[in-house]
């Protein structure tokens, strides 16, 4: 049948409509600066095939982990014709896969990492640094297929890396499961602004400024790389300059110098790099590959395109003899030889050892009749020529047991850093040792307060002289450090009373000190009066104070509500708190408290949405939370901006009613273009002041639509109930023990 048809009246030809859903010019094309609220609505049930009742933690507990590991050990040496194993062992490939899955983590915002299995989705599945890792995941498919829902891709990729190390003679520190797979690309992660892969720092929209200052929160030197350019900064083969890049990038994913040396030297003990021929032979990445390739990319026309003809990074060769065995070979070779700079067959800068002894020659990965000199990348040589790395590397060389322990611990940290507290760890191989980077909190070792105690403590808190804004602000400050990205922060531990949080400007240290002293007095009086060991922690009391204040504010508005509260938080010690590690949680802006530390190139409302996403909020939750915080009078420094009510400390929908009032006109102030005055349209009399954060709920069409829901005459009760629900959510974001 022809796709053309004629109208029986006019005789004109009309083409059949072709579905073009999702195509065409988008809102983002028309208005590039439009606020990106889509990051608040990711990973919904509509993209998840597992169903609403699926509980991954429960499924993982049914897994025979030992059996999975045996299957992984077996596949390591089961070389497949379609992608032959180097030296008959896939260990090096799977270590690289696990490393690159975890290595996207950056501690600046906690995003990236191995926690969601995103290496199998765009853009990571097609990054230049992940060339041919698609093959590693296909090698794992029979095992994933066998165990199905009991193990996620995210867990399997990390476990495969562990098993690769173990199968080659290394004793790992442990393994924890619990990573749940994502089913759609993560839209909230900022990977950089460059518009070409591997763009160097002299290209437009560079991530570098000044004296090679890397843009925050990025932790990789070029678009599409995990860490550094192995050839050197911007491809310049300078080992000392490369050391600076290595230090900066590894530090940004929470590794110190000793951990960095251990990771590089330990990881490069295994496997090889692949650069058998020019990159012009390599086809498109998975996302751009033809449909018949079925999700595989980088098809190569060089020779067989695999085995000894493989092209991945462009660098060619192995670092040491016996690349499928754990030993001290990497560090021995690194310091034993002098190195000459050469170009690989693919044209990449690398270094070959000079005057190599026969015992250090490396047998070909796919042709045992051939032997090759050891290779080092420019980044590898930074371990020898960087003045800080060099003595660490030599110490490891002279102390093999220390080196093995350092690598085991660093590898565990690399692959588990974004999982959050130990309470999320699953499986029989979870290490018993508590590590400071896990942000530990004491176990509950006492009887918890009951409903009667909770009611009594609320009365005492509200009678203490502390105001609603003080109690709400303190509870918010304690709980809102949580990041859904790496599951750090939150109210558990009461670290708001410790450095660095007690001194953060956003937390108003003087006010905070007053509130904490008062709450500590209530805590001590309660605990001292108990027989039998019942106690209340300060962490619980801080949250309870906020809940009591919200209840009182709702009561002031005529609503009798009970804010949910579950005790069980404990108080961390200074010894359990890494000050430097917690410093990255300090907010540069908190729109919920109308706070901004300085002026930034990023608009205030964008910072609000970013923070809301880290708090796992939806757009409606963000909206009702801001509206409630304003009428509760919780602004930083007590500023009146956005407090659109004549009855503060009363939980009403006044913020929305007055923001949406057409009787008010808004203009930026002469002193600050980001502060606005709202004047009576008829008289010109000043009514309100507000920030960009406040006004965006009337300006942005999507947020205004939500604000209108809460601004209606019949929405008072809904507003209070919704605010209480999201408040409770924030207070419990880190309570993984309640799941």
From Swiss-Prot:
Instruction: Please tell me where heme b binds in this chain.
Output: 268
**Any single GO BP term:** hydrogen peroxide catabolic process
What the record notes about the co-factor is: Binds 1 heme b (iron(II)-protoporphyrin IX) group per dimer.
Descriptive protein name: Catalase-peroxidase
Similarity-based family:
Belongs to the peroxidase family. Peroxidase/catalase subfamily.
- Active site residues of this protein: 100
- Keyword Repeat attached: no
Name the catalysed reactions: H2O2 + AH2 = A + 2 H2O; 2 H2O2 = O2 + 2 H2O
Name the coenzymes or cofactors required: heme b
PANTHER family given in the database record: CATALASE-PEROXIDASE, HYDROPEROXIDASE I, BIFUNCTIONAL CATALASE-PEROXIDASE
Q: Where is this site: Transition state stabilizer?
A: 96
**What gene name does this entry carry?**
katG
Enzyme Commission number(s) of this protein: 1.11.1.21
Q: How is it modified after translation?
A: Formation of the three residue Trp-Tyr-Met cross-link is important for the catalase, but not the peroxidase activity of the enzyme.
- State the source organism's domain of life: Bacteria
Cross-link type Tryptophyl-tyrosyl-methioninium (Tyr-Met) (with W-99), placed at 227-253
The task this protein performs is described as: Bifunctional enzyme with both catalase and broad-spectrum peroxidase activity.
| Quaternary organization | Homodimer or homotetramer.
Give the EC class as a word.
oxidoreductase
What organism does the record attribute this protein to? Syntrophotalea carbinolica (strain DSM 2380 / NBRC 103641 / GraBd1)
Question: Do you know which InterPro entries this protein is assigned to?
Answer: Catalase_peroxidase, Haem_peroxidase, Haem_peroxidase_sf, Peroxidases_AS, Peroxidases_heam-ligand_BS
Q: Provide the alphabetized UniProt keywords.
A: Heme, Hydrogen peroxide, Iron, Metal-binding, Oxidoreductase, Peroxidase
- GO CC terms in record: cytosol
Q: Which GO terms describe its molecular function?
A: catalase activity; heme binding; metal ion binding
- Cross-link named Tryptophyl-tyrosyl-methioninium (Trp-Tyr) (with M-253), where? 99-227
